[in-house]
UniProtKB/Swiss-Prot annotation:
Highest taxon above the source species: Eukaryota
Protein name per its UniProtKB record: Nuclear factor of activated T-cells 5
InterPro entries according to UniProt: Ig-like_fold, Ig_E-set, IPT_dom, NFAT, NFAT5_RHD_DNA-bd, p53-like_TF_DNA-bd_sf, RHD_dimer, RHD_DNA_bind_dom
Phenotypic effect of disruption: Embryonic and perinatal lethality with incomplete penetrance. At 17.5 dpc, 50% of the expected Mendelian rate with only 3.4% of the expected number living past 21 days after birth. The few survivors to adulthood fail to thrive and their weight is half compared to the wild-type. At 3 weeks old, kidney hypoplasia and an altered medullary morphology are observed with an increased apoptosis in the kidney inner medulla. Under osmotic stress, the transcriptional regulation of osmoprotective genes is altered in the kidney medulla.
Phosphoserine, modified sites: 120, 134, 155, 560
RHD domain segment(s): 264-443
Post-translational modification: Phosphorylated at Thr-135 by CDK5 in response to osmotic stress; this phosphorylation mediates its rapid nuclear localization. Poly-ADP-ribosylated by PARP1 in response to DNA damage, promoting recruitment to sites of R-loop-associated DNA damage.
Residues bearing the modification N6-acetyllysine: 122
Primary role: Transcription factor involved, among others, in the transcriptional regulation of osmoprotective and inflammatory genes. Binds the DNA consensus sequence 5'-[ACT][AG]TGGAAA[CAT]A[TA][ATC][CA][ATG][GT][GAC][CG][CT]-3'. Mediates the transcriptional response to hypertonicity. Positively regulates the transcription of LCN2 and S100A4 genes; optimal transactivation of these genes requires the presence of DDX5/DDX17. Also involved in the DNA damage response by preventing formation of R-loops; R-loops are composed of a DNA:RNA hybrid and the associated non-template single-stranded DNA.
Tissue-specific expression: Detected in white and brown adipose tissue, muscle, heart, liver and kidney. Expressed in lymphocytes (at protein level).
Upregulating conditions: Up-regulated upon hypertonic conditions, this up-regulation in not observed in ES cells.
Record-listed Phosphothreonine modification sites: 135
Length: 1534
């Protein structure tokens, strides 16, 4: 009895809570004071009488006797006690009505009962009797005494009477808290039993009342209830009454019988039983699922509880017993002692194939009984048990509010078997499952839209966020670099009054640096208990206008624009000043500021949008008023001009970028006033103007579409024009944003005026070209503004002529041009570095313009870009300060660059604009402008990204831009894609996803760049492509053909632009490629991406569409040489190839696909096919770039990556795998990884960003090299030759499967190098493939012969890059890439030889012929690594992985060899790699190694360029050094 009493007491422990809950605190007093039993007696009598229908008076004693006899614990309590207990507990469980009423009524009686039990059996008996009398009073619900469940508990039975009584009270409360299950049991029984609660009618009161449950609970009933429903002293009463009732009901028989059999059974629900006993064990073989939505009684069935795979069901096995037994299943509490759950019941699920079972009610708890049969090995999959949720109101009615306080939403399935021993006794085994969450999990929060995209650094503005699943406890976080936990983040203040699940209002927190000079992009995400939002929304902090003179400047600027009220006047002014750089700068600033304001106004006026150029300008001028608001203008500028990316990413990063991209592209074609001015300064126009125009265009997509349509025609013209004039236009566009940033504008104007004046005046041809371009642009822009397409056609012709002149300059001085370009590249590197320093500002505004154009353009343009980039002077000042600090040397170099650029300005500008600038620079720059904004938004998000962007953007404009964005935006498009991608990628940028996208985009970009600078070449297709065409065949002619072909290609790729421009780019791309649609992922984004030349990038991002698009782009690139002749067919082919490239996915799937790829390659038999295939692969890689995140991570584990790469890279890898060596397959897979991994590795190494940055640097360098090379090649017309030459090797490569690698590398590298490098890239890739594929050796030989100079450059830039890229994830595989260039033949000859040959390969990268000859792999490799851009990047990329890996990668393409190579790798290389790897280390170390690497790479670049003079190489090295010093930023970001 003491034990019973104790159990009752433990149930009573809740008595404390019942105390407060129950009207009678005296009950508690009564428990200890047995004397107080009489008052409870009445209560208990009432409860005994139990309305539930228990025969309180007589049945209880009988029950008591039965119970006492049946239940040892109850017997210990005393016969009466046991009966009381038993009855009460069953009552509690079985009759929740009784329980609640009885409990309430019984609160006294049960308390009495408890005390009685505590006192003695006699007292209990008396109590029972008393309770019977009290039954009449039973209606006194108030007297619910604490549930004696615990009293019933066996564990409590040993308590002393009074002490137990007290304990029981405490234990009750304890139990209730301890196990919701007891409480729930109570609640369940009360729920079922609760006749009191009218609602309960729906519950099966009779069922639950059956004594079965009561008997179970006899002793443990109270326990059961006490835990979850422990608080119901009424339980005790109700249990008592219920028992009587239940016993009287047949429950008695059941109870007795079950008590007999099941005293164990009755304790079953509340009692604690072992899992293993007497050699018998009840095991849960398969645990149930962790979350199962319970159903309400009024709902339909939600099915049975499944296992965690959702394919099966929880499975139970009984070991050590071979006779049929009954398995009982009920729902218990989620933790602690096993008790029935108060709020959840088991319910039977019937179905065609479910196990037959029966539903039994024990103590108010539903128990499912299923047979365990030896025929099934005593194993049973329980597929017939669901979970039923009881209504809280029913539970409360049953057990009282106190008992139902604890609402646990977790439950366990409890499995129990009763095994009858030979002596007739019963052995009970019980095992609970793991907890199951019975509610719907909270949804992950999402942000769908926000009202504000940018804000000053002061913050405090309100942002409305519309989204999903904003639950209580939501936090809105602003974080600078979402991927870096240590970056600045701040929690925004939420207006809780207007808090809602789907919307909330927050105040923007102030930015930590109140003195930024350039817009900074951060990410916004929401965190709730369910996790954080996956998509990170971009948000831009703009410099405080009050802090700087921006307002004054802006006002001044605005005032000047205010004077020209009409667009015509402005145009006239622009025209008059068009030739004058200074005037042009000023006018564009004035015009641009209005443009920006007009963009702001455009929101008001949709018509201006229609006539993008004219209306824009006129609205701009007309909207001098708008401009009048300096801050608005500045903000608009920062959003539009300074950060076209801002406006696109900030305002509507997804939609805006597309329109912006289109707008940007379109503005190029058609901003009459701005273009005139801008085209005078080519640089500004593509990026800035598009930004400005984008800003103005953003408001009306129709106008944008129209503009885009116009732009399609104009795009060819304007792009040609832009190619030659891009620098000036960009500068002016930059100035336009600068005007918006008045201080920056002034500085930019002065700088641009000075620089452009130096640049343009110094080269007479350039000045002539510029003047012609200005005239053409002025006329054509005016015409385009007024006449739209006809004007654009004229403009195209004019542009073509101007580009021809430029190209003539370029081609006339191939060596000089190359030198100039090398210098420009070096200068660009410096400028880029400077811009890198400025890159934050550049990122914020037309950073890419600075990066891209400045690379190609003069430092002055970089300055103007910086100014433009910085929406405010403060931004540029900061940039300048950064430049000065980080790049005083760079500044000096920039000055030198400016001088050298001025000297070589004519050549360089002509070269840069038409070829280098146009090809890599102008395309890249306009993308850069577009990108920069995004970069601004994205980079601010990731300072590392910024650093990377700076570094990368500085070396190659496109690469830099891509790098600066580092995010998909960068990759997606040098400029416009950046915008669009940034818009789409902004969020991505902001988030880890963004990083992956960035990685993938960047990879795509890198690959794009590598595959003929596909991004730039997308622009190249429009502008760079034309440039490349110019390089290959007369910039203008080829540009036209490219535009025509490229138009088609652009229709596939650049055509995207046309279509995109006519429609939103997404639309363009949708039409552009079914694949684009197939790439649903980034169709819109792709639209944006494609909208700019970056469609390819996006295509890369999305496999199907980007594959097709990329092929065309690649074709255009590849066909830049080849494609010129057959660009459309190749484009078509490349789409086919790309469709085949879907086959490439098959190729990715493996060799068959590889063969297909090869056949594709063979079918195309041109590098462009190769590139397209490779690009498609790359695209696939990029498309699978998210996979590349796989690959990236897999790249870390390349074999893993290889499967994914096989998906991604295997097209290429398959090509690689086609090679005889299986390891080469892996390596080639890695090579492909490296190629994509260049991207992939960038993204995939521990420091994927660093790798990407490194890769980007490499790519940028390569791009520069490519530009140089392309200039060289274009000057030499080697591109065409190369293309033709390359085509055969690609064919060879394709046929041998080597081409996949070669094509990939070519595509990656040649994209990087543009087409001139494409052949070398192919060859390089072929050599890399040669490792795997002996056939490559033949290709390799042609590759070296054809592209020894190109290949050298290619190799320096691209193969190493690929290897390097590979290195982060898997150096060995990446090694394959490196091997391919130089050691391909050697590798073909013997894999072991390649070790030494590899060093030659790498050294050939420095000097492909000579180094190839040299076999000391470690040293050459070290030098190669140091010297080759790829080497540097390799080191950098390897840095993520390991210097050994780097050496290994360099050392060998073959994995086995890789280990050897790794071991043999020169210490220098590892050291430098280590330094680069430790880019996290002091930037100085990374810098030094990077500097050495970059400088060495620059010389390599010159070998790569082969036309580049060593002096130029030295300049490049210096630039690289300065870049590396600036690159410290990159290094830091790495």
């Amino acid at each position: 009895m003491p034990s019973d009493f104790i159990s009752l007491l433990s149930a009573d422990l809740d008595l404390e809570s019942p105390k407060s809950l129950y009207s009678r605190e005296s009950v508690y007093d009564l428990l200890p004071k047995e004397l107080q039993l009489p008052p409870p007696r009445e209560t208990s009598v009432a409860s005994m009488s139990q309305t539930s229908g228990g025969e309180a008076g007589s049945p209880p004693p009988a029950v008591v006797a039965a119970d006492a006899s049946s239940a040892p614990s109850s017997s210990s309590m005393g016969g009466a006690c046991s009966s009381f207990t038993t009855s009460s507990s069953p009552t509690i469980y079985s009759t929740s009505v009784t329980d609640s009423k009885a409990m309430q009524v019984e609160s006294c009686s049960s308390a009495v009962g408890v005390s009685n039990r505590g006192v003695s059996e006699k007292q209990l008996t008396g109590n029972t009797v008393q309770q019977h009398p009290s039954t009449p009073k039973r209606h006194t619900v108030l007297y619910i005494s604490p549930p004696p469940e615990d009293l019933l508990d066996n564990s409590r039975m040993s308590c002393q009477d009074e002490g137990c009584g007290l304990e029981s009270e405490q234990s009750c409360s304890m139990w209730m808290e301890d196990s919701p299950s007891n409480f729930s049991n109570m609640s369940t029984s009360s729920y079922n039993d609760n006749t009191e609660v009218p609602r309960k009618s729906r519950k099966r009161n009779p069922k639950q009342r059956p004594g079965v449950k009561r008997r179970d609970c006899e002793e443990s009933n109270m326990d059961i209830f006490d835990a979850d429903s422990a608080k119901a002293p009424h339980y005790v009463l109700s249990q008592l009454t219920t028992d009587n009732k239940g016993n009287s009901k047949a429950g008695n028989g059941t109870l007795d019988s079950q008590k007999g059999t099941g005293v164990k059974k009755s304790p079953m629900l509340c009692g604690q039983y072992p899992v293993k006993s007497e050699g018998k064990e009840l095991k849960i073989v398969v645990q149930p699922e962790t979350q199962h939505r319970a159903r309400y009684l009024t709902e339909g069935s939600r099915g049975s509880v499944k296992d965690r795979t959702q394919q099966g069901f929880p499975t139970v096995k009984l070991e050590g017993h071979n006779e049929p037994v009954v398995l009982q299943v009920f729902v218990g509490n989620d933790s602690g002692r096993v008790k029935p759950h108060g709020f959840y019941q088991a319910c039977r699920v019937t179905g065609r194939n479910t196990t037959p079972c029966k539903e039994v009610d024990i103590e108010g708890t539903t128990v499912i009984e299923v047979g365990l049969d030896p025929s099934n090995n005593m194993t049973l999959a329980v597929d017939c048990v669901g979970i039923l949720k009881l209504r809280n109101a029913d539970v409360e009615a049953r057990i009282g509010i106190a008992g139902s306080k604890k609402k646990s939403t977790r439950a366990r399935l409890v499995f129990r078997v009763n095994i009858t021993r030979k002596d007739g006794s019963t052995l009970t085994l019980q095992t609970p499952s793991s907890p199951i969450l019975c509610t719907q999990p909270a949804g992950v929060p999402e942000i769908l839209k926000k009202s504000l995209h940018s804000c000053s650094v002061k913050g405090e503005e309100e942002v409305f966020l519309i989204g999903k699943n904003f639950l209580k406890g939501t936090k809105v976080i602003f974080q600078e670099n979402v991927s870096d936990e240590n970056s600045w983040k701040s929690e925004a203040e939420i207006d809780m009054e207007l808090f809602h699940q789907n919307h909330l209002i927050v105040k923007v927190p102030p930015y930590h640096d109140q003195h930024i000079t350039l817009p900074v992009s951060v990410g916004i995400y929401v965190v709730t208990n369910a996790g954080r939002s996956h998509d990170v929304q971009p948000f831009t902090y703009t410099p405080d206008p009050a802090a700087g003179a921006l307002n004054v400047n802006v006002k001044k600027e605005i005032s000047s624009p205010a004077r020209p009220c009409s667009f015509e006047e402005a145009m006239k002014a622009m025209k008059t000043t068009g030739c004058n750089v200074d005037k042009v700068t000023i006018l564009p600033n004035a015009l641009i500021t209005p443009l920006i304001s007009s963009s702001m106004i455009k929101t008001e006026d949709v018509t201006p949008m229609e006539v993008t150029s004219e209306k824009r300008s006129s609205p701009i001028f007309q909207t001098t008023k708008s401009i009048g608001s300096t801050q608005q203008t500045l903000e608009t500028i920062s959003n539009i001009a300074g950060g076209a990316p801002f406006s696109s990413p900030s305002s509507s990063s997804h939609l805006t970028p597309e329109s912006e991209n289109q707008q940007q592209l379109q503005p190029k074609a058609y901003n009459p006033e701005t273009l005139t001015t801008i085209q005078t300064q080519d640089i500004s126009q593509p990026g800035t103007f598009p930004a400005v125009s984008a800003a103005s265009q953003l408001p009306s997509s129709d106008a944008l579409l129209q503009q885009a349509t116009q732009f399609q025609t104009r795009e060819a013209q304007s792009r040609d024009t832009i190619q030659s004039d891009t620098v000036v236009n960009l500068s002016q566009l930059t100035e336009a944003s600068q005007q918006q940033q008045s201080p920056l504008q002034e500085q930019a104007q002065t700088l641009q005026q000075q620089i452009p004046s130096n640049i343009f005046p110094s080269p007479s041809s350039v000045s002539q070209l510029q003047s012609t371009i200005q005239q053409l642009q002025a006329g054509s822009f005016t015409g385009s503004a007024a006449g739209g397409r006809s004007g654009s056609v004229d403009l195209v012709q004019q542009v073509l002529e101007a580009q021809q002149q430029l190209s003539s300059v370029l081609f006339s001085t191939p060596d000089g041009n190359e030198n100039v370009q090398e210098q420009l590249n070096a200068d660009i590197f410096q400028v880029s570095q400077i811009q890198n320093s400025v890159s934050p500002g550049m990122f914020s505004s037309a950073e890419s313009a600075v990066h891209t154009r400045p690379d190609n353009l003069l430092p002055g343009r970089a300055d103007s870009v910086h100014q433009q980039t910085e929406n405010t002077l403060s931004n540029q000042q900061q940039q300048q300060q950064q430049q000065q600090q980080v790049m005083e040397s760079s500044a000096a170099m920039v000055m030198e660059m400016q001088q050298s650029i001025c000297q070589a300005a004519a050549q360089i500008q002509s070269e840069l604009f038409p070829s280098a600038a146009s090809a890599s620079g102008s395309l890249q720059q306009s993308p850069v402008y577009q990108q920069p904004s995004h970069m601004m938004s994205a980079l601010p998000t990731n300072e590392d990204m910024q650093m990377q962007c700076e570094l990368f953007s500085s070396p190659p404009a496109a690469s830099g831009n891509e790098t600066s964005t580092t995010t998909t935006p960068q990759v997606a498009t040098p400029g416009s894609t950046m915008f669009q991608t940034p818009s789409s990628g902004d969020g991505e940028e902001t988030g880890a996803q963004a990083k992956q996208i960035q990685n993938s985009v960047f990879q795509t970009m890198v690959q794009m760049q590598r595959s003929g600078d596909s991004q730039p070449q997308v622009n190249l297709f429009s502008s760079t492509k034309n440039i490349m065409s110019v390089q290959n065949n007369g910039t203008q002619q080829q540009g036209n053909s490219l535009f025509q072909q490229g138009s088609e290609m652009m229709s596939l790729q650049s055509g995207n632009f046309l279509q995109q421009s006519s429609h939103s780019q997404a639309q363009l791309f949708h039409p552009q490629n079914p694949i684009a649609d197939a790439q649903n992922l980034s169709q819109e984004t792709q639209g944006s991406i494609f909208h700019s030349p970056n469609p390819i990038v996006h295509s890369q991002t999305s496999t199907a569409s980007s594959e097709q698009l990329q092929p065309s782009m690649f074709h255009s690139q590849n066909t830049i040489a080849v494609l010129q002749g057959s660009s459309v067919p190749q484009d078509q082919q490349s789409p086919n190839i790309f469709l085949s490239q879907s086959s490439i996915n098959n190729l990715q799937t493996n060799t068959v696909a590889q063969e297909e790829q090869i056949s594709f390659f063979a079918a195309q038999n041109s590098i462009s096919p190769l590139q397209s295939t490779s690009n498609t692969e790359q695209q696939a890689a990029f498309q699978q770039q998210p996979p590349i995140s796989h690959i990236q991570t897999p790249i870390l584990s390349q074999e893993q990556a290889q499967p994914s790469q096989q998906g991604l890279f295997q097209p290429q890898v398959a090509l690689g795998s086609l090679p005889p060596n299986p390891m080469p397959q892996n390596q080639q897979g890695p090579i492909f990884q490296t190629q994509r991994p260049i991207v992939g590795m960038q993204s995939n190494s521990p420091s994927q960003e660093q790798q990407q940055q490194q890769q980007q640097q490499q790519q940028q360098q390569q791009q520069q090299q490519q530009q140089q090379q392309s200039i060289l090649f274009s000057n030499q017309n080697a591109m065409a030759t190369m293309a033709s030459q390359k085509q055969p090797p690609p064919n060879m490569m394709f046929s041998p499967n080597q081409n996949p690698m070669a094509s990939q590398e070519q595509q990656n590298q040649s994209i990087f190098h543009q087409q001139s490098n494409m052949a070398p890239m192919n060859q390089e890739q072929q050599p890399m493939q040669f490792q795997n594929q002996p056939t490559v050796s033949s290709l390799q030989n042609p590759g070296p012969t054809q592209s020894e100079s190109p290949q050298t450059s290619l190799f320096h830039s691209s193969p190493q890059i690929q290897l390097v890229q590979g290195s982060p994830s898997s150096q060995d595989q990446q090694v394959t890439l490196f091997l391919s260039p130089a050691s391909m033949s050697a590798l073909q000859t013997s894999i072991n030889q390649p070790d030494m040959q590899q060093s030659p390969l790498y050294s050939p990268q420095n000097n492909i012929p000579g180094i190839q000859g040299s076999t000391s792999s470690p040293q050459p490799q070290a030098t190669l690594f140091h010297n080759t851009t790829g080497g540097t990047i390799n080191q950098i990329q390897n840095s993520p992985g390991s210097s050994q890996q780097t050496s290994g990668m360099f050392l060998f393409g073959i994995q086995n060899n890789c280990s050897q190579l790794l071991t043999s790798g020169p210490a220098t290389l590892p050291d430098q790699l280590m330094a680069i790897n430790q880019q996290g280390q002091p930037q100085n170390e990374g810098q030094s190694s990077v500097t050495t690497l970059l400088s060495q790479q620059m010389p390599e670049t010159s070998p790569l360029a082969s036309s580049v003079n060593s002096s130029q190489n030295m300049e490049k090295i210096d630039l690289l050094v300065s870049l590396q010093s600036q690159g410290n930023n990159l290094t830091g970001s790495f």
